[in-house]
């Protein structure tokens, strides 16, 4: 999601998973013997390890299905894969891409070509466990099903902050009352700083006006009060207006107690805490309205060669057992609703287990970051 998914390094990668045989469908009607399924997954390099060492071995044990995984570095060819799926549909051919994980906006683009299978509880039982109002589900027009996610949350040092802010306005007030003890990273270098910027913009313009596929630069006039607000905070930011480069730099400032509060990625914060790279006094909490976040969504082409196998695999991936692996390995959010997760997992994520605000689309993101640089970072005090 972002400068993304998280010391978990944020690069994009692809996996191709070939399922050699299928013996059963988890809540999906049998369609005879299924020869295989090819799955492309975009994500970080740690996603490869999760599939290779955890998910696929468990899947094989539970289904007697043999799998093969091919890892393609850095997510090369995401758009060409979409073009390949569209081309096959236009020529009336099947595609060997049975499952495709990509940005929800790509899925939305493909939906206009009629290339995706609409996934519901009628053709995949565990689809009922996914919140239909999740931002990425809405952006992908219901054709994309999330199986993992993450959001930006508020990190604070409980040794110095006894009662953390629970709203964005309370954060703004805290910053002014505690000069020098808060910062956020340059939005051009990290997703957590961008989230702090986007929620400020959403104070003066509706999130839904900027998160869809349409783009109207004239709407950006609504952002001016937000940019003025962020500029007014500059003298209260750490080191008189220092915005570090990257998510890691913010976590390091928190770890050294140079600052007491900052927005961070939920999975990065949890990962640092688990590794002892942040003091135990650092706590994570989501605020209202929530910071932005994102899901990794999977779609199944309507003309996939092994569509039934694809539905089976995705349905298995949305079981509570598989989702627990995803959450624990990535310190992120499950694709299914939290209420379907084991109690110990819910307890671990109690402070941040909420929905997140949608991201602006790519054009608005680029404009917002440019305007922040011009009118906030580049301005005087």
Tell where the protein language model's regions lie, with residue ranges.
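Early extracytoplasmic/lumenal segment of secretory-pathway proteins
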Residues: 33-105
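Extracytoplasmic ligand-binding site segments that recognize negatively charged/polar headgroups
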Residues: 42, 46-52, 76-79, 97, ...
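A ligand-binding cleft/hinge motif common to bilobed small-molecule-binding domains
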Residues: 107-109, 261-280
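Periplasmic-binding protein-like
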Residues: 150, 227-233, 277-302
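Mature extracytoplasmic/periplasmic domains
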Residues: 291-360
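Conserved C-terminal helix/tail region of periplasmic/extracytoplasmic solute-binding proteins
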Residues: 354-381
